[in-house]
Amino acid sequence: MSPQYHFYFVSFRNLVLNEKCLRSKKQVMKSFNWYKTDRYFDPHNILQHHSRAIEKTRYKLGMQTSSESTDAKSDFLDEPSAYLIEKNVALPKDIFGSYLSYWIYEVTRHKAAVILLVLIVTSILLLVFFYNTEFCVAFEILLFSFCFPGTCMVVIAFSEPIGDREFKVKLLMEIITRKPAVKGKEWRTITYKMNQYLFDHGLWDTPYYFYRDEDCHRYFLSLIKGRTFKKQKESSASNVKDAQSNDETAGTPNEAAESSSFSAGPNFIKLLTKAAEIEQQFQKEYWRQEYPGVDEFF
């Protein structure tokens, strides 16, 4: 190799090694493979190929950086999609090792339960160290008088189901939208979202109200249990008849406008009826798959 070609080769090698756009030695060696024969050791060809390689690499890195920044921005601004929620659902049953550890966690996060525990521990300590004083006896009676109603409040708080109307509407909307099967994975997603809703709106102290998806399903069944629902067709027909009768007896438009009433939010009875129809449909499909030939019982 002549000294002139050697000079150009060394110069190009230093430029390539100093170029930060090339990330790995594999890319650098790929660029060197172009110069294995003497036919390519022309100074003009070397510089031209070098500039093309750098521009191509910068373009690829620029596209990759822009796509990564766009993805990061979209992940930061947008809410998680339904697919990501379904793939990353973690219920308390999956997080805690046992139901006892879950129950202890819930109790220690409940304010009334913590106050009750403090009162009980204080009463026990006073009884142990100051059991022979009259003041201690009087104070013990006072503490226990607070402990009894406090215990009742904690038991009611953990045993009584959520009665918030907006929460029930949210649950019915999720059921109508997702149409969950009896043992379907959709119930896991619904349970996860309802736990988050209770925590975000201050209805529960932790995002772990429902321990598993069966608990959320059981809560929904308690809403429709013992209720009698009319079919949507019948209700729609009755609505038409009622509308016709109202038109006949309404009188002037101003009188009709005055007789109308404002309803905030969706109709709860209609939501409950639609969700009950979906549940009944999937109940039939579930039992038909489990025990074929039992259509006569539905």
Swiss-Prot record:
TM ranges are 112-132, 138-158
What keywords sit in the KW lines? Cell membrane, ER-Golgi transport, Membrane, Transmembrane, Transmembrane helix, Transport
Cellular location of this protein?
Answer: Cell membrane
GO cellular component assignments? endoplasmic reticulum; plasma membrane
- Extracellular face residues: 133-137
Region (Disordered) residue spans: 235-262
Chain intervals for the UniProt region annotation (COPII binding): 297-298
Chain ranges sitting on the Cytoplasmic side read 1-111, 159-298
The source's superkingdom equals Eukaryota
Family annotation (InterPro entries): DUP/COS
Assembly state and interactors?
Answer: Interacts with PRM8. Binds to COPII coated vesicles.
Q: What is the name listed in the Swiss-Prot or TrEMBL entry for this protein?
A: Pheromone-regulated membrane protein 9
Gene for this chain: PRM9
